[in-house]
Design a protein with these regions (language model features):
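A short SAM/SAH-binding and catalytic strip from SAM-dependent methyltransferases
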Residues: 81-94
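Conserved Class I S-adenosyl-L-methionine
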Residues: 158-221
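A short glycine-rich, Lys/Arg-flanked "PGG" loop and its adjoining helix->strand segment in the class I
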Residues: 95-109
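Class I SAM-dependent methyltransferase SAM/SAH-binding core
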Residues: 15-17, 21-71
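Short alpha-helix
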Residues: 136-151
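Short, glycine-/aromatic-enriched active-site segment of Class I SAM-dependent methyltransferases
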Residues: 115-134
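A short acidic, Gly/Pro-enriched loop at the edge of an enzyme's catalytic core
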Residues: 70-81
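Conserved alpha-helix/loop element of class I SAM-dependent methyltransferases that forms part
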Residues: 1-10
């Protein structure tokens, strides 16, 4: 929030796109004087978010919206900030930043995280995996160029260290594998999903020096 230069002294209107269960949404509501529209296409995530918001005393600041990120019903120049953490890949980075720009007020801030290569060359095994899973993975300079082409001034960039992936994402996911399989009766489809996630985790543990989530902060011009 400091890097983005968000003004804590005035009310802000924020859209959190692909909010999930609201970890970032609730943090923003606590830290800023803000009204937040929390968007996700899974209603069960939004229900969990609402429970968390009430328990944290910020429910009145948050409105949930169950829809897809590529069919947002927002008005032009409606928001001061668009925030999207670990979700824009569902739409594609370039498509997302291009489509969402019109929802920002002049000078509004875009804050998004995106899987990003940390090195110019990668092992073939890793490159092949991400070419199939998400071909838009690229180095930060390429992502910054996309922002510039679509009417933004890049303000800051940083990447998340390995412990963020492991402690906050992969380890909690691993802890749920057995319960997930049990809940789905050890079905073939469930086992395929778990095997796929295990493969992704193994790749990250092996090649964490080559990629991470990059956080991009940009200003609409």
């Amino acid at each position: 929030m400091e890097l983005a230069g968000l003004d804590r002294s005035r009310p802000l209107k924020i859209a959190d796109i692909g909010c999930g269960t609201g970890v970032s949404t609730i943090l923003l509501a606590k830290e800023l004087e803000t009204k937040i529209t929390a968007v996700d296409f899974l209603p069960e995530f939004l229900e969990e978010l609402q429970i968390r918001a009430r328990s944290n005393g910020v429910a009145e600041q948050i409105t949930t919206l169950n829809c897809s990120m590529d069919t947002l019903p927002f008005s032009d120049e409606e928001y001061d900030v668009i925030w999207s953490e670990g979700a824009i890949y569902n739409m594609g980075f370039e498509a997302g930043v291009a489509a969402w720009r019109r929802f920002l007020k002049p000078g509004g801030k875009l804050i998004v995280s995106e899987i990003t290569w940390l090195r110019a060359t990668r092992p073939a095994e890793l490159q092949s995996y991400w070419d199939e899973e998400y071909p838009e993975v690229n180095v930060a300079s390429a992502k910054i160029g996309i922002l510039e082409r679509h009417g933004y001034i890049p303000k800051a960039y940083f990447f998340l260290p390995p412990h963020c992936w492991l402690e906050n994402y992969y380890r909690p996911m691993q802890d749920q594998f057995d319960a997930f399989l049990k809940r789905h009766g050890q079905s073939k489809q469930a086992k395929t999903i778990v095997d796929s996630e295990k493969h992704e985790i193994t790749l990250y543990e092996k090649y964490c020096d080559y990629y991470s989530y990059g956080v991009y902060i940009a200003k609409k011009v």
